[in-house]
Swiss-Prot record:
It comes from Arabidopsis thaliana (Mouse-ear cress). CDD domains: Bbox1_BBX-like. Belongs to the CONSTANS family. GO terms for cellular component: nucleus. Its main location: nucleus. Zn(2+) 1 binds at C9, C12, C32, H37. Residues 324-340 have a biased composition (Polar residues). Residues 385-427 form the CCT domain. Disulfide bonds: none annotated. Zn(2+) 2 binds at C52, C55, C75, H80. This is Zinc finger protein CONSTANS-LIKE 15.
Length: 433
């Protein structure tokens, strides 16, 4: 692919496209790639790689150091798969990158050496040495060598300058776009600060060795929310500061996270245990203040509700018993006193008693309405059944059982054929007339 056949960038249409995004199926230059893939966290996960030197339409997968070419899978098969001589070429697989690497990291990834990158590295070494000397630490050869053992993260890239240049035929185009990207300051001032800022945005926090502005930015809304919450609690408690302390004490009394039974007393303005309920209520009742009131806890409320339900069931059962025994001989006083009252059906009994008990719960008016409705339904059902029987009888009277002749020709032939004892005579055996 010659210089006239260079693929333009799909985003700007001016520069030469050097990267291929698999997710967007787009060919981009380096500045447009930085602009497109720094939009959100999802776009940073897109895998990009260089464009094939042969076809210019597919991402590269193989690098040939002998011919200084980067080829896609199909072009590599066409070049190195059909010729036995090309099998001796030195090749290696090419992996794409994701994230938003800086210009220096891209240059190190592709084996390019930028002069600006060298100056930055020379300036960083004495600065790091000065910082370590201030802390009383010395950098020895073992510490410097241990940097190679660190596992790189998603945004760090291994420097492959020792493997030689791997940028293909368009080394000058890559160098020009890298320098433009470095001068524009899209990534950051020296290339590293931009990545650190993006890492802070992605991870939500920065190291303590930084400027501290990101940490302060995260702490300011949290402290403002705490102060606002404290002011709200003070307003609820009448403007005093005791409410906040009591709230914090209630939170810190159970550090293990267990659920302790606590009841908030509106009269005292603090929380107390359930065992103090009866004592406090007794104190309020003993004072005899007409304007004072107490709030029962959940257990007392449930007990009162259950006792009310039991009383209601007892009254209903008593009325039911009176109605059932109104038409019978009343038992003696001793028998009625000794007779136990049961609220549930005994073991082995059928559901007729439950149904009877449920029917008696309804009032007399409800029973009368139910009987009237049932009688009307039965009459309507009988009338509908009678009408259906009448229609059936009328239809039966008009029913005809006439025989239908399907084929007229067969009927005429059957009428003219000779019969012997009701059976047809074969044509071969029939006598001639």
């Amino acid at each position: 692919m010659s210089s006239s056949e260079r693929v333009p960038c799909d985003f700007c249409g001016e520069r030469t496209a050097v990267l291929f995004c698999r997710a967007d199926t787009a060919k981009l230059c380096l500045p447009c790639d930085q602009q497109v893939h720094t939009a959100n966290l999802l776009s940073r996960k897109h895998v990009r790689s260089q464009i094939c030197d042969n076809c210019g339409n597919e991402p590269v997968s193989v690098r040939c150091f002998t011919d200084n070419l980067i080829l896609c899978q199909e072009c590599d098969w066409d070049v190195h798969g059909s010729c036995s001589v090309s099998d001796a070429h030195v090749r290696s697989a090419v992996e794409g990158f994701s994230g938003c690497p800086s210009a220096l990291e891209l240059a190190a990834l592709w084996g390019l050496d930028l002069e600006q990158g060298r100056k930055d590295e020379e300036n960083q070494v004495p600065m790091m040495a000065m910082m370590m000397d201030n802390f009383g630490m010395q950098l020895d050869s073992w510490v410097l060598g241990s940097n190679e053992l660190i596992v790189p993260s998603d945004t760090t890239f291994k420097k492959r300058g020792s493997c030689g240049s791997s940028c293909g035929r368009y080394k000058q185009v890559l160098c020009k776009q890298l320098e433009e990207l470095l001068k524009s300051g899209v990534v950051g001032g020296d290339g590293d600060d931009g990545d650190r800022d993006r890492d802070c945005d992605r991870e939500g926090a920065c190291d303590g060795d930084g400027d501290g502005e990101a940490g302060e930015g995260l702490m300011v809304p949290e402290m403002s929310e705490r102060l606002k919450w404290s002011r709200d609690v003070e307003e609820i408690n009448g403007g005093g500061g005791g409410g906040v302390n009591q709230q914090w004490n209630a939170t810190t009394t159970n550090p293990s996270g267990g659920q302790s039974s606590q009841i908030w007393d509106f009269n005292l303005g603090q929380s107390r245990g359930p065992e103090d309920t009866s004592r406090v209520e007794a104190a309020y009742v003993g004072k005899g203040a007409a304007s004072s009131f107490t709030i029962n806890n959940f257990v007392d409320h449930m007990n009162e509700t259950c006792s009310t339900n039991v009383k209601g069931v007892k009254e209903i059962k008593k009325d039911d018993y009176k109605r059932s025994t109104s038409g019978q001989v009343q038992p003696t006083k001793s028998e009625s006193n000794n007779r136990p009252i049961t609220f549930g059906s005994e073991k082995g009994s059928n559901s007729s008693s439950d149904l009877h008990f449920t029917e008696h719960i309804a009032g007399t008016s409800c029973k009368t309405t139910r009987l009237v409705a049932t009688k009307a339904d039965l009459e309507r059902l009988a009338q509908n059944r009678g009408d259906a029987m009448q229609r059936y009888k009328e239809k039966r009277k008009t029913r005809r059982y006439d025989k239908t002749i399907r084929y007229e020709s067969r009927k005429a032939r059957a009428d003219t054929r000779l019969r012997v004892r009701g059976r047809f005579v074969k044509a071969s055996e029939a006598p001639y007339p």
